[in-house]
Amino acid sequence: MVDGTVDGRSYRCLLDTGTGRTHIVADDFISEFAPLRQIASSGVFAPSNDVLIQLPDVTVGALSRRPCEVVRLDVGQPGARNLLGMDLMKTHRCDFLFDDGRLVIDSPGQLETSHDLHLDDADHPYVGVRFPELTAQAVWDTGAGITIVDRGFLATHPDSFHEFGSSTGTDATGAQVETPTFVVSEMTIGGVRFSPHRVAAVDLAPANATLARPMDLILGFTTLVQANWHFDFSRQAVGVTRGFDR
């Protein structure tokens, strides 16, 4: 979670690289702003229609946007919470230091070792995930609690996954679905090998149908916490250094 301001008023947000646009839950102040338009969006489990409003500014530390179009969420919407999206991060270097619980913005110097990073039209960051037989495409999503693997991908590469119970997941629309879970046995990102950990299997075909670049995985906290991540979003480069296992 990060603390920020909207027109000088304090708001706490979940930092969410999996959403292209910042979301703010309506309160008395936010409700004063007239809707600009509605846009269609999609979570992992369900589609939704979002209301856009324009705020004077949104600021979180060195991240700031003036003015800033955000999605306004109804306070009664299931799972509604403030989300700091890629609209504030996409022009910055962001170092996600999970072993120290810190986010560093615009640190000086170049990445010592970098790999290609792709941002799609909605500014979702994609990284390559190396399995023994191929490289998969994954969205790097700090808003996801558990890593998600597409069921179709899992079915064609079963040797890398071992069944392990089930879990109830919630997507950005608030929809909840119970999903089977697996342990991923071996994968490498940015030259760093990740220890076996739990992932959830979800049919990503509906979400992928709306994307120019389909995703095989959505990397969530269970994966991200094992490393430190150094993103230069403006140069579309990422470096990965070994953190600690959890």
Predicted regions and their residues:
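Pepsin/retropepsin-fold aspartyl endopeptidases
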Residues: M1-R246
